Amino acid sequence: MNIELKDLSHNPVYAQVREQIESQIKNKTLASGEPLPSPAALAQKLSVDKGEIQRAYFELEQLGLITKHTGKDFLGKPRIDYRVAISNAR
């Protein structure tokens, strides 16, 4: 997944991230069921606040483009995974 933020954009960071992920899902660059990086990992990669990524993911989830799965890691700690929605064969 490739996300590029534009410093001169009038759109907030979360909107830029949401729009780019949405575009990649719709043009099939991101495949159905493909895992997305955690909000923390993507925020670190883009050097932005994790809340910006969480908001973008929340909005994508509300649009039905991604799904959120909760589970536990191998140590039993809670873990949340985000994936491109399976039903997203548009």
Where are these regions (language model features)?
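Extreme N-terminal segment that seeds HTH/winged-HTH DNA-binding domains in transcriptional regulators
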Residues: 1-36, 41, 47, 85-90
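N-terminal helix-turn-helix
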Residues: 35-68
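HTH-adjacent hinge/linker in prokaryotic transcriptional regulators
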Residues: 58, 62-90
